[in-house]
Amino acid sequence: MVSTFKYLGAIISDEGSKKEVICRIAQATAALTKLSTIWKDKEISLSTKIRLMRSLVTSIFLPVCESWTLNKDIEKRIHAFEMRCYRRILGITYRDRVTNIQVVEKVRAAAGPFVELLRVVRKRKLKWFGHVTRGTGLSKTILQGTVPGKRGRGRPRRTWTDNIRDWTGLEGDALLRRAENRKGWRKLAYVASAVPQRPIRLRDR
């Protein structure tokens, strides 16, 4: 029995989503580096650079993000990766003593409303949960099913649906009933996907 394998381009591991997220960050960072000449080109506007980054870099990171189980460590990695991308585009290093809040303000001023990458991931997960809950296929059976047998010793591992319960504040039948209402779930997903405000600091370590 193997503990890790690759399926349809995604890393499946019995240790959770960390390896897959790290791999996606590495792939997206490589794409970011290959486009360095664009980021350094002063003839290209900042708003255009930001659109290109979101189209050509974060698009590499996001596939299958709906399947990830997030924890604090993974969320910090996602946030740090996003800030690293914007700093590269802006030509700002950590030695410049510019906070992440200031980076976001510069991005917002150049490209309009700012939606955190982590919020995009959370919203996609919530949207997928609603889609599966309203369906009738195997995905719904697996999502709502239980594994027979006794649970092993120690603290239980964080599950995919733990994220949904934590973000929405709902559990059990109440969660399922809300998800079955397409319009109501869309509104809840917008609110529940919001990322708590982080303290001002230069970087996420």
Give residue ranges: language-model regions.
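Short linear motifs embedded in intrinsically disordered, charge-biased segments
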Residues: 1-205
